Amino acid sequence: MKKKVLAAVLVAAVSMSMAGCGSKQAESTDNGSKTESEAGSDAAAADSGEKKTLRVGMECAYAPYNWTQSDDSNGAVPISGSSDYAYGYDVMMAKHICDELGWDLEIVKMDWDSLPTSVSSGAIDCAIAGQSITAKRLESVDFTDPYYYASIVTLVKKDGPYKDAKGLADLKGATATSQINTVWYDTCLDQIEDVNKLPAYETTGTMLVSLESGACDLICTDQPTAMAACVAYPDMEMLDFSSAADNYQVSDEEINIGISVKKGNQELVDDINSVLEKMTKEDYEQMMNEAISVQPLSE
């Protein structure tokens, strides 16, 4: 879920940049399975005062939120069951949460679509994976407060036919796509008049390659993902219509990024929120900018 960026993200494609968000299918190095005895041991450890280990699931292929790299540079964390390491905004946030709460951290790499079921089954404690807090997801998992506030943007080629677009009306008739199971694909693209909507892509990397190769005119994504893409692909340009009335219409819940936990696990939600409430949007932006600045451009 690299040839060009987005460490793990763009790896699948050549290899990738943030709400909400998207869908991506990466090769799993750990199926995230936790036996009942292991789960019981975790609970016993917590009850006895032993240091808790937070098992965090993510795709490790969705830069700048998370990616895979071959060493521990910049503070990357080992991926469970693998010789590789994970880093990115999500890993930085997971480390910060565990540092504040005095917990150990374990990163579990898994396919994007398996995250909700892994959270629900208790195979992982939570998913910190760039997931937007949608009503559909809230049917199966609970969410913390947002740990990033994403905006939706459009990616085009600098020399493409829509490079001068100032709003959605200027995108009329465009051939467009995005990632599967995202608000970008399910909600936003249909707001473009006469859009030629291609099938959704499984990964961020393949989505970006479709634009780079000319298979589509534009893709819809979140701002961090687009920013990282522009680092990987200098011939791409991000169009932000947020200051115009003619913009994608979505709710805050659809683009705010949260940490998913098992339904009913209010204790974990409260613990994580106790860390997030001490942070500001400026803290999030600073952390995201750092992630974008160190994302691998090749692997």
Residue ranges and their predicted role:
Residues M16-G20:
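C-terminal motif of bacterial Sec signal peptides marking the signal peptidase cleavage site
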Residues G22-Q25:
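Bacterial signal peptide processing site
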Residues K34, G49-G130:
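Extracytoplasmic small-molecule ligand-binding "clamshell" domains
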Residues A45-A46, V183-Y201, M238, D270-E299:
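Ligand-binding clefts/hinges and TM-proximal coupling segments of bilobed small-molecule sensing domains
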Residues C60-A63, S83-D99, Q131, V153-L208, ...:
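Bilobed "Venus flytrap"/periplasmic-binding protein-like clamshell domains
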Residues D104-D170, D246-D252:
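Acidic, polar ligand-binding/catalytic clefts
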Residues S114, G130-S140, T187-D190, D217-E253:
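A ligand-binding cleft/hinge motif common to bilobed small-molecule-binding domains
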Residues Y149-V156, A232-N273, V294-E299:
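Periplasmic-binding protein-like
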